[in-house]
A protein has these predicted regions:
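N-terminal Rossmann-like NAD(P)+-binding subdomain of aldehyde/semialdehyde dehydrogenases
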Residues: 1-94, 138
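Rossmann-like NAD(P) dinucleotide-binding subdomain of oxidoreductase/dehydrogenase enzymes
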Residues: 84-166
Length: 166
């Protein structure tokens, strides 16, 4: 990928992040929930891909996919807990309020030996907080990345580009 292609990818991610962040967090959480459900449906084939590419035994591969599913479940709960504090101010007739603001584009680099779990740790939390993600998977785990991306694309509707693979 040359620098122009990279810049185009980053700009595309910025564009989708602005659209994504405007959704209320519980709605973002619902898409993450659907993603987790799709991972549940694809658990066996995704685990087979991990076994093939990362050379893990089947039980380890199944555990890694389960970790991704568990992160989806965790993020769904978080989507209803992104509240801030309201505090008294030293200034008369004023109050202080703590708010969550998305960062925008978040990067994630994953190694071949944990091709799905590490991505899920980063993506699920970043996404539910209103961010898009650019993912650089290991070149030794491309099929794992493609499997995750296909699962997301299946449930994400207009937000398929929330995950962009470098």
């Amino acid at each position: 990928m040359n620098s122009n292609e990279y810049e185009a990818l980053v700009n595309k991610s910025k564009e989708i992040s602005l659209k994504w962040r405007s959704l209320p967090a519980p709605q973002r959480g619902e898409l993450i929930r659907l993603f987790g459900e799709e991972l549940r449906l694809q658990k066996e084939p995704l685990a087979q891909t991990i076994t093939k590419e990362a050379r893990k035994i089947k039980t380890e591969s199944l555990g890694e996919v389960q970790e991704a599913i568990d992160m989806c479940d965790f993020a769904v709960g978080l989507s209803r807990q992104l509240y801030g504090l309201t505090m008294p101010s030293e200034r008369p007739n004023h109050r202080l309020q703590e708010l969550w603001h998305p960062l925008g584009v978040v990067g994630c680099i994953t190694a071949f030996n944990f091709p799905m779990a590490v991505f899920a740790w980063n993506f699920c939390l970043a996404a539910v907080c209103g961010n898009s993600i650019i993912w650089k998977p290991s070149p030794h785990a491309n099929e794992c990345a493609e499997g995750i991306k296909k699962a997301w694309d299946k449930v994400s509707g207009d937000f398929a580009d929330l995950i962009l693979i470098l």
